[in-house]
Amino acid sequence: MNNLKQGKFITFEGGEGIGKSTQSQMLYEYLKSQNTPVILTREVGGTAVAEKMREILVHEELLPMSELLQAMAARYDHMVRKIIPALQDGHIVICDRFIDSTACYQGLELENGIDLVYNLHKTLMPSLMPDITFFIDVEPDTAIERVNLRNMSNKFDVRGIDFYKKIYDCFKELSNRFPERIKTIKASDLSPLEVHELIKKHLYTR
């Protein structure tokens, strides 16, 4: 990714309390400072319609298939209304969570659910996958300690250490499954600035 002036799709992934949103924001601010056309967005959400769907998904207890379809419907709206137009205009799109989060959070709850998630995505938008995904690798024990310091929470935040470990293992599995796309940043013992510098190094050496 030597030329960041062209439209590229960058996603940040991982469990709760790992600093994804912080790193997404830091990269966004850095690219803006370099006069690079860039937008920052998130999932589930990113558009007015998708944000309404997010409220249901993160606070209500849905049936597993209903939760997956809710996430996919929100993503379709987000892709068509925001992500694709920005990429077509030559912007860098930074997204806090994308398809891999759906695979781990919703796919794990269904039989063969991870493959189902990626197959659904290919059906909806066969040509749109991230150019690079940063998996912020923070050990579950550390992550849950960070979440417990927050003032706000959703249904995923409060599910306990077994859930955190399951999600962590899923992202590790995906990083092995898609090694060309998913870059693991081991961040448990690093400051946010140190993580940010590693991310920049990966971007400019691709």
From Swiss-Prot:
The keyword Transferase applies. Its EC number is 2.7.4.9. GO terms for biological process: dTDP biosynthetic process; dTTP biosynthetic process; dUDP biosynthetic process. Disulfide bonds: none annotated. ATP binds at G14, G15, E16, G17, I18, G19, K20, S21. Keywords: ATP-binding, Kinase, Nucleotide biosynthesis, Nucleotide-binding, Transferase. One of its GO terms (cellular component) is cytosol. It is an enzyme of class 2 (transferase). PROSITE patterns: THYMIDYLATE_KINASE. It catalyses: dTMP + ATP = dTDP + ADP. Pfam families: Thymidylate_kin. GO terms for molecular function: ATP binding; dTMP kinase activity. CDD domains: TMPK. Belongs to the thymidylate kinase family. Phosphorylation of dTMP to form dTDP in both de novo and salvage pathways of dTTP synthesis. This is Thymidylate kinase. The gene is tmk.
